């Protein structure tokens, strides 16, 4: 099962792309954060807009920062805690924008 082309159009308009289908009913979509983090989001194909909405709603900025702060300056991770925080906030906004745009599609 694949996502409908109308959803792919929304993804492309916001610089997201379909990365892969997992074979178990999920799809991986990808984008890059302002600081260059490779974001790969895995959600259900069925009810795709709702799945993205739930992922965006549940994305925890603090948890994301905690995961990265111990790797500051490594492998492309920003060395500044402030930049990591700002980037995590931007990721949350990217996810919310994508979710909102997908939910508007009829």
Map each language-model feature to its residues.
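Charge-rich, solvent-exposed alpha-helical interaction surfaces
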Residues: 6, 10-13, 64, 87-101
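Intrinsically disordered, low-complexity regulatory segments enriched in Ser/Thr/Pro
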Residues: 36-87
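Generic alpha-helix signal with a bias toward terminal, lower-confidence helices
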Residues: 23, 28, 53-57, 96-97
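Negatively charged, low-complexity tracts enriched in Asp/Glu with abundant Ser/Thr
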Residues: 1-37, 75-81, 103-106
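Low-complexity, intrinsically disordered/propeptide-like segments
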Residues: 14-17, 42, 51, 71, ...
């Amino acid at each position: 099962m694949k996502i409908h082309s109308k959803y792919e159009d929304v993804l492309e308009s916001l610089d997201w792309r379909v990365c892969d289908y997992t074979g178990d009913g999920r799809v991986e979509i990808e984008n890059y954060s302002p600081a260059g983090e490779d974001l790969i989001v895995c959600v259900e194909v069925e009810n795709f807009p709702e799945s993205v909405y739930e992922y965006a709603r549940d994305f925890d900025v603090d948890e994301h920062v905690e995961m990265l702060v111990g790797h500051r300056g490594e492998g492309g991770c920003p060395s500044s805690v402030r930049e990591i925080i700002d980037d995590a906030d931007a990721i949350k906004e990217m996810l919310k924008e994508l979710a909102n745009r997908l939910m508007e599609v009829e």
